[in-house]
Curated annotation (Swiss-Prot):
Gene responsible for this protein: menD
Protein name, UniProt field: 2-succinyl-5-enolpyruvyl-6-hydroxy-3-cyclohexene-1-carboxylate synthase
Biochemical pathway: Quinol/quinone metabolism; 1,4-dihydroxy-2-naphthoate biosynthesis; 1,4-dihydroxy-2-naphthoate from chorismate: step 2/7; Quinol/quinone metabolism; menaquinone biosynthesis
Catalyzed chemical reaction(s): isochorismate + 2-oxoglutarate + H(+) = 5-enolpyruvoyl-6-hydroxy-2-succinyl-cyclohex-3-ene-1-carboxylate + CO2
A Pfam family of this chain: TPP_enzyme_M_2
Membership in a protein family: Belongs to the TPP enzyme family. MenD subfamily.
Gene Ontology biological process terms in this record: menaquinone biosynthetic process
PANTHER family: 2-SUCCINYL-5-ENOLPYRUVYL-6-HYDROXY-3-CYCLOHEXENE-1-CARBOXYLATE SYNTHASE, PROTEIN PHYLLO, CHLOROPLASTIC
Keyword tags: Magnesium, Manganese, Menaquinone biosynthesis, Metal-binding, Thiamine pyrophosphate, Transferase
Quaternary structure (record): Homodimer.
Length: 579
């Protein structure tokens, strides 16, 4: 009887935690099978306000949660059992920490007496994520630990938190109650002991709010009208780095038009294909005319950070700025150039709505837009109308998007090709990436998380090694109920290293490229996914268009030679330099 009471107490704590998370704005919970996390798993199963996502691989599970949180702009809970199951979340937690994505890890754990003594599946879990997650260590469930203390601990840990929080939950056996009932039913039919324990939460049970609410008050001092007038008195540029779709970066274009300054944008700005900005800035900086023009800039206003283009970063670093303002949503030091500047922790909207006057040097760089358009003409000629290749596929994908679509771009070559060559277009998709740590792991799972929350047609374009890294997550693709197209650009290895100064080809082949000779048709079949292979742009465009006719996921493999993309990048760069 005492043992069963212990199992019920474990479940009660799990239900209180999950209920409080739902009240704090959690909409999704990602779960992997495991026994020690049973109180949390059963609590999630009985919680009607949470959408549950199940996956057998914790590494992919963590990245799926990352995608869900990115898309929903809300915290997402992850439930794992003890041991290496927790450790497998580490890559996703690192990415979430660097990009301010709120993940809540609920890890089941052995009780203290079973730690560091040779007990099965027991590791030291507290602080396992080091600096990459805020840590909360809960004791084993006990009537001596007040229920309101449990909830207030959760509330405090998550207050104003935009990065991962790890809540380690120790449980003694038994873990399985005789029946699973809802928290409301527990309250209604509770024994005298349980009723006494829950009494401090009577008011909490009568509403849907968290026990403790923390108000977030912004006290940042934004520039005054006089300060704005001084800042815009001269030739300036606006540079836009990584922004989320909900940041509404179109406001920046309107601000630029008001000031009369050009806008240089990164692939992750949500503005890369906008006709009113300088999207081809990476290549434009190779052009002597454009460089001469941009060197005249005295002032710079930067939104976001984490730029992909090294040339753009070098331009920012080498200029002697009279005034340098940097706007970031969070307090990150997004400052790899280490220049003297003014940092403003504020939203895009807050800055764009300031009473900006028109610049005294408005329209000083009007020549940049025609130069940007001339590069677009070059790319049509040298990419779209030539030999089948990686950049051609990336441009075809970008052109096929609408503002109702999601485009997730993988790391290594795909994101760089999009940054360098994405076409100018009037309708552009919501862009998602994993560029905090810029790893090639977890991309399929993250994209599945984004798609699951948004329920919109989605494309993921990635390289072959990235796909091999996250192969297990093809199982998540099978769960998609909207058009989802995975485009694998297979150049047989890590051929981004063709662009780097490895001393000789033997070293490049043996230690960097790692050619594998694999194709993905049987892998797609293993997971029951529709599969097409494309060896020319006509077959690719047909397969890509047809894939969106079905409310499920499909795979298109694009086979290209190992040196095609690097050779083309070199060729185009030389042409731009000479004209």
């Amino acid at each position: 009887m005492q043992q069963q009471t212990s199992a019920d107490m474990n479940l009660l704590w799990g239900q209180l935690i999950l209920e409080e998370l739902a009240r704090l704005g959690v909409k999704h919970v990602c779960m992997a099978p495991g026994s020690r996390s049973t109180p949390l798993t059963l609590a999630a199963a009985s919680q009607t306000q949470l959408t549950r996502h199940i996956h057998f691989d914790e590494r992919g599970l963590g990245f799926m949660a990352l995608g869900l949180a990115k898309a929903s702009n809300a915290p997402v809970a992850i439930i794992t059992t003890s041991g290496t199951a927790v450790a497998n979340l580490y890559p996703a937690i690192v990415e979430a920490w660097l990009t301010h994505v709120p993940l809540i890890i609920l890890s089941g754990d052995r009780p203290p007496e079973l730690i560091d003594c040779g007990a099965n599946q027991a590791i030291i879990q507290p602080a396992i994520f080091a600096q990459y997650a805020k840590q909360v260590n809960l004791p084993t469930p006990d009537l001596g630990y007040p229920a309101n203390a449990l909830l207030s601990t959760i509330d405090h840990a998550l207050a104003n938190q935009h990065q991962p929080v790890h809540i380690n939950c120790m449980y003694r056996e038994p873990l399985y109650p005789t029946e699973l009932v809802t928290l409301a039913h527990v309250k209604k039919t509770a024994s005298v002991t349980t009723s006494t324990y829950l009494a401090p939460l009577n008011q909490w049970f009568e509403n849907t709010k968290p026990l403790t609410r923390y108000a977030s008050l912004t006290s940042a001092e934004l520039p005054t009208t006089d300060t704005l007038m001084r800042f815009v008195h001269g030739k300036g540029v606006i540079v836009v780095g990584t922004l989320a779709p909900e940041d509404n970066p179109q406001q920046i274009v309107a601000l630029a038009q008001k000031l009369g300054w050009p806008v240089l944008v990164d692939a992750q700005s949500q503005l890369r294909q906008h006709p009113g900005v300088i999207g081809h800035v990476d290549q434009l900086l190779l052009n002597p005319k454009a460089n001469k023009q941009l060197e005249q800039a005295e002032r710079i206003l930067v939104f976001g950070g984490r730029f992909i283009s090294k040339r753009l970063l070098q331009y920012i670093a080498q200029q002697s700025w009279h005034s340098y303002w940097h706007v970031v949503k969070h307090g990150d030091r997004l400052d790899p150039t280490h220049q003297s500047k003014e940092f403003y922790q504020a939203s895009v909207q807050a800055v764009c709505q300031l009473p900006w006057p028109r610049s005294s040097q408005a329209n000083w760089a009007l020549q940049l837009l025609p130069l940007n358009e001339s590069l677009e003409s070059l790319f049509k000629q040298q990419i779209d109308n030539t030999t089948f290749g990686e950049a051609q596929v990336v441009r075809a994908i970008a052109l096929a998007q609408s503002d109702q679509h999601i485009l997730f771009i993988g790391n290594s070559l795909p994101i760089r090709l999009y940054d360098m060559y994405a076409p100018i277009a009037t309708n552009t998709p919501a862009i998602y990436t994993n560029r905090g740590a810029s790893g090639i792991d977890g991309l399929i799972a993250t994209a599945c998380g984004v798609a699951a929350d948004k329920n919109a047609p989605t494309t993921l374009v990635m390289g072959d090694l990235s796909c091999l890294h996250d192969f297990n997550s093809l199982a998540l693709l099978k769960q998609m109920t909207q058009p989802f197209v995975l485009v694998i650009i297979n150049n047989d290895g890590g051929n981004i290293f063709n662009l780097l100064p490895v001393p000789n080809e033997s070293l490049r082949n043996d230690f960097y490229r790692l050619s594998h000779g694999l194709e993905f048709g049987y892998g797609a079949a293993m997971f029951g996914l529709a599969y097409r292979q494309a060896d020319d742009i006509e077959s690719f465009n047909q397969a890509y268009q047809e894939a969106f006719e079905f409310n499920c996921a499909s795979v298109i493999e694009v086979n290209v030679s190992p040196t095609q993309a690097s050779d083309q990048i070199t060729q185009i760069s030389q042409w731009v330099k000479q004209h």
